[in-house]
Amino acid sequence: MMTRLEFCRRSAGGIAGMLASGAVPALVPASVLGKEAPSNKIALGVIGCGRIAHVYNVPSCLKQGGKAICDFIALSDVDLTRVRSMRQKLAGKDMQGRDLVADGRCFQDYRQLLADSAIDGVLIATPDFWHAQMAIEACRAGKDVFLQKPMALTIGEGRAILTAAKKYNRILRTGTQQRTEENFIHAVECVREGRIGKVVRVEVGVPDDPKEYNFPLEEPVPAEFDWNMWLGSTPVVPFTRLRCHQRGKNGAMNYARPAWMTIQLYTMGMVANWGAHHMDTAIRGLGEELGGPVSVEGTCVYPKRRLWDVHGDCDITWKYASGAEIKMASTRKYPCGVRFVGEKGDWVFCGFAGKQTKSDPVGVSADKVAGMPIAASRKGIIEAPAAKPLLRPMEHNREWVEEMRTRGPLAMPLEEAQRTSTACVLGYMAMKLGRKLKWDAKAERFVDDAQANSMLFREERDGFGVKQHLKELGMA
């Protein structure tokens, strides 16, 4: 199926060819060739108008010149108050003087948004358990996709997303921004160039989740909130703000960290939240982007709370065929970020603290790197630029828009994103099962472990989830 954007691109190319051959007069308006014409702007929709979309994704897509080539023209959320709030944020007119987001393009059911042929791509920023189904259905509808991390909650879901993107020839980008941030890129370059010798260990530090709010365990479903749709493939349970997202006084918008991020029915916790970012950098530094561990084991502490039950302190080890290990723990043990350790004790650290500067410290002790963008055990490791530099793409939301326009290549190839997602899922499963798991990365199966293999997909409520799409994807 040819999308609106692809039709415009091909039509412009055909007209340009006729101009070059003299088949049509040279005095043709620039808009006919698609230059700044309304039809040539990338039309985007948002599925999930909460914190991440409102504060990060939508503004980032539009900045750095993005406004010149894309518009958000449709919105969807099960909570219509959030749709209205996002519409106000995007208040404006298109090049023909029309409202960018019309009343007819504000939806409570995302499937209506996907059915709109005017939309070229969708930004999916919903609770984690919705990611796979929505991404697959968006690809099938001919939309390119920006999918928030984690990519999926199971290994089977991740493979199904990858299969759908390939089958329907869609650009699908995941929200792992460290591929576009200088300090993480340069740390990977230093490691891959052997500046710390053979890597024997990578330490990944992730934050803890917040304490549970003192909300009731059951509340009336708010007006304009489709609770059944919010639950999707998960079991039917009573509504409470402790399960979904908060609201401020008198129903005002509240874009604090949503409550669902702390419940195992809906997410995997920090192992796949911040872990999705840090594990990607760790795996990239080891050169295992298209590989996987041979085993994983882990333990964790599950907090005793009324409802919020994701893991607290964790201790997970992924072991690779090279002998290198990735170890993940909370920031009580490791600083938030990624530290590569070489066989002779040299190391490089990179973390969330802004961009690299010339004054970034070297020669600091490993327990003093918290809050630093990049640091190393001694001088000479991180100062010099890379002999073979890695790609320096633009900010990852804006990069997705550019990838839609040019049709690639992807700064974060989808196969690599799926492998990072798989690593996070493996860590979560090791904690849940409480034992060592042996993994065959090529077959994407556990070795001699029927119980673990039975968890490659989740149980799903009738009418929801990815299993209904497996046959069309050739996976059933």
Where are these regions (language model features)?
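Core domains of carbohydrate- and sulfate-ester-processing enzymes
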Residues: 203-253, 358-360, 455-460, 467-468
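N-terminal glycine-/serine-/threonine-rich beta1-alpha1-beta2 phosphate-ribose binding loop
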Residues: 1-144, 156-171, 471-476
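Short basic (Lys/Arg) and small-residue
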Residues: 149
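Non-transmembrane alpha-helical segments in soluble domains
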Residues: 8, 62, 84-87, 111-114, ...
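Residues that mark the start of a beta-strand
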Residues: 41-45, 198, 325
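Glycine-enriched catalytic-core subsegment of oxygenase/oxidase enzymes
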Residues: 34-35, 73-78, 82, 90, ...
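A contiguous active-site-proximal alpha/beta segment in oxidoreductase catalytic domains
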Residues: 144, 152-232
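Rossmann-like dinucleotide-binding domain that binds NAD(P)(H)
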Residues: 228-322
